[in-house]
Amino acid sequence: MAITIPNREEILADWEAHPMRKPRIEKVTINIGVGESGERLTKAEIMLERLTGQKPIRRKAKKTNRDFGIRRGEPIAVKVTLRGPKAYEMLKRLLAAVDNRLKASSFDEHGNVCFGIDEHINIPGVEYDPEIGIFGMDVCVTLERPGFRVARRKRKRAKIPTRHKLTKEEGMVYMMEEFGVEIVEEEG
């Protein structure tokens, strides 16, 4: 069942009156956790590069886990970070893979959203390649307001005031308005 945000009209009116308060996409991070190094990790890297047109980086294990046969420092995942118009276009394709539906629990308290894709072949425009196989992936969308640079810059760095931080509801409204996403409650 789709969720309705009670103060949606207030949020939209605020963005209309104050354009600098309207959120935007800072980055889209796509991660494929393979759990092992070797041929399967290389195939995931090739697939992610074909999908995004950008060279992915390898992520290393932080701890040794004997049960999974993982050593500390061993590459076990690949990820790519997209920014700007490239991130926007890729997010449209990735949301189509999940039927433009997101769970309310996928949003954190700062309006960011993460969701998973079970099989990469569900993404529009992606063909199945038997040499590579099928991979699932995690997609994290980081939202920000204009002016968040003051927290990241080197000189004259400042904290973002609470009134300028994004809320969970604003993140939901942004995804609904910008991408036509339907936000659903938990099933079960």
UniProtKB/Swiss-Prot annotation:
This is one of the proteins that bind and probably mediate the attachment of the 5S RNA into the large ribosomal subunit, where it forms part of the central protuberance. In the 70S ribosome it contacts protein S13 of the 30S subunit (bridge B1b), connecting the 2 subunits; this bridge is implicated in subunit movement. May contact the P site tRNA; the 5S rRNA and some of its associated proteins might help stabilize positioning of ribosome-bound tRNAs. Belongs to the universal ribosomal protein uL5 family. GO terms for biological process: translation. One of its GO terms (cellular component) is ribonucleoprotein complex. Gene3D superfamilies: 3.30.1440.10. This is Large ribosomal subunit protein uL5. It comes from Pyrococcus abyssi (strain GE5 / Orsay). Part of the 50S ribosomal subunit; contacts the 5S rRNA and probably tRNA. Forms a bridge to the 30S subunit in the 70S ribosome. Pfam families: Ribosomal_L5, Ribosomal_L5_C. The lineage of its organism: Archaea, Methanobacteriati, Methanobacteriota, Thermococci, Thermococcales. Keywords: Ribonucleoprotein, Ribosomal protein, RNA-binding, rRNA-binding, tRNA-binding.
